[in-house]
A protein has these predicted regions:
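Cytosolic covalent-transfer regions centered on His/Cys nucleophiles
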Residues: 1-162
């Protein structure tokens, strides 16, 4: 069973920010600009510029490139209206540079958390996501899933397996 740290991925994964088979970004800045706009458009953040700055600030603290075609950029700021996770699967990978580390990225999980949120909420979401990413079944799911509903069902199945 995946350790959830009090966070259920099914509760924080955002349907409107599950974007499958998008054309690759040219760079991380284009990704951050795009995702900040999507988070604002869908009512997750009140100010896309503030959220983009929060993403960039977090990048200055350490890498969000995880290897294996995965990046987990995240931002904490008061402009986050509701905590959530967006998932983007690209058609092809692009070069993602992050705090001195770089590599190809095709799967992106973007976290938005209010800076005044619950005790270490962002760390608990990250820890839960890391638990999923260690599961071969979850990796297969993120590679092959065709819809948010399919991704959600797979997450719920994995969460209840012993």
């Amino acid at each position: 069973m995946i350790e959830t740290h009090g966070i259920h991925m099914a509760d924080v994964l955002l349907k409107e920010l599950t974007i499958l088979d998008r054309e690759p970004f040219t760079d991380k800045d284009q990704l951050f600009q795009f995702i900040s706009g999507e988070f604002e458009k869908n009512g997750v953040v009140s100010d896309k510029e503030a959220f983009q700055e929060a993403l960039m600030y977090r990048e200055s603290l350490g890498p969000t490139y995880m290897g294996d075609d995965i990046a987990i950029p995240h931002g904490r700021c008061k402009e986050v209206l509701k905590s959530g996770v967006g998932f983007i699967r690209l058609k092809d990978s692009f070069r993602y540079e992050s705090a001195g580390e770089a590599g190809p990225v095709k799967y992106i999980f973007v976290l938005a958390v209010n800076e005044a949120g619950e005790d270490n909420e962002h760390l608990r979401i990250l820890a839960t996501l890391a638990g999923y990413l260690m599961q071969d079944e979850f990796r297969e799911l993120m590679i092959n899933v065709q819809s948010y509903e399919e991704l959600l069902a797979g997450i719920q199945t994995l969460a209840t397996q012993e």
